[in-house]
Design a protein with these regions (language model features):
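Charged, helix-rich terminal subdomains or tails
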Residues: 1-350
Length: 350
């Protein structure tokens, strides 16, 4: 049961359960933790009381503490012994029972926050109170709102850290990916103006890989996302506001990931759902796309497409669609990511 009420009591007070675990504090004090119902039942004589992630003001005028601490209910009694590996072994939330057995790690933070605080508020409106309000609002998102987002998705993951302007999450690789999309959407809606953005790195690791290395390597992916620059059709240049997906050379804008890569992955899954050549085709296609600059790659891809869709009623249409995606550099990058996502989703667990 979650402990969300923390009471500081005098050691000499006898009206609470002495067998209850406690933490000794200086000056003859002790810290006890309760769930809300048990606290109300016991009603200890307190010096001070704190509530975690609750707006409740009826518990002895408690001090509110906000903390991003979402932890999935894995229904595994040995979770404390197995650690994070439990999430790799869990079936992903949106792809039940399928996919590679891997951990996903998400690291993200707000872009250009120093500039926002320095010049984001017009000079004539700048004040200490407005700056403090901006800081508090961002902190509230990463300490309180983040829990609501992950609880709504029931994602198989755990927050390692979330506060200030950044976060670090570990869990089932697929759930981490979908959670990242939800977090970005929620942050955009929370800020309301599109000026504040986040960049992120998403890594995928074996369950036995050292957690410190996961953090470091995913941090490098986050740094790669911070370097993202794209020139738009109207001549404007967009920077950051991006995500590095598994590799530092696979950086996409959030819109590309959610509006191109993810829908394309689902389209690919639909196309190959009843195609026995599906998985083998995908592996070969990814290899050709990664080496598309080689002269022989384009003809080989055309041949592979023709053979793979042989017998399909809409063979010509499918071949044209895949070949057109491969012929454009940005579309090709999105296609590779979608194919990799699909392969990881259908690969045998192990």
């Amino acid at each position: 049961m979650h402990k969300d009420v923390f009471a500081i009591v005098d050691c000499e007070v006898e009206n609470y359960t002495k067998s209850k675990p406690r933490l000794s504090l200086p000056f003859g004090k002790e810290l006890l933790s309760y769930d809300r119902q048990h606290y109300l039942e016991e009603q200890p004589e307190i010096t001070r009381v704190y509530t975690k992630n609750s707006w409740d003001a009826g518990i002895s005028l408690a001090t509110h503490i906000w903390m991003g601490d979402y932890t999935a209910d894995t229904n595994d009694t040995d979770v404390s012994e197995k650690g994070f590996a439990v999430y790799a072994r869990c079936a992903s939330t949106l792809e039940k029972g399928c996919g590679i057995k891997r951990l996903g790690v998400l690291r993200a933070d707000v872009d250009n926050l120093g500039t926002v605080f320095a010049s984001g508020i017009p000079f004539e409106k700048a004040s200490i109170s407005r700056t403090a309000t901006l800081s508090r609002s961002l902190s509230l998102f990463f300490k309180q709102k983040i829990n609501e987002i992950l609880e709504k998705g029931a994602y198989q993951l755990q927050i390692i850290y979330s506060g200030g302007d950044d976060l670090f999450i570990i869990g089932n690789w697929s759930d981490v990916l979908y959670a990242a999309l939800d977090i970005r959407t929620a942050f955009r809606d929370f800020t309301g103006n599109g000026v504040l953005t986040i960049s992120a790195g998403i890594g995928m690791f074996d369950e036995k890989y050292p957690i410190a290395r996961m953090a470091s390597e995913t941090g490098a992916l986050e740094d790669a996302a911070k370097l993202y620059v794209k020139k738009m059709a109207d001549g404007t240049v967009c920077s950051k506001n991006a995500v590095a997906l598994w590799r530092s050379d696979a950086v996409f804008s959030w819109d590309s990931l959610s509006n191109v890569v993810e829908p394309r992955m689902r389209e690919i899954a639909s196309i190959f759902a009843h195609n026995e050549k599906g998985k083998a085709f995908v592996y070969k296609m990814v290899t050709l796309l990664r080496n598309y600059d080689e002269v022989i790659s384009a003809p080989r891809l055309a041949y592979l497409l023709a053979r793979s869709f042989e017998g399909s009623e809409n063979r010509d249409e499918l071949c044209r669609r895949f070949y057109s995606w491969a012929s454009d550099e940005e579309q090709r990058r999105c296609l590779v990511a979608a194919l990799e996502w699909y392969v990881y989703s259908i690969r045998e667990r192990g």
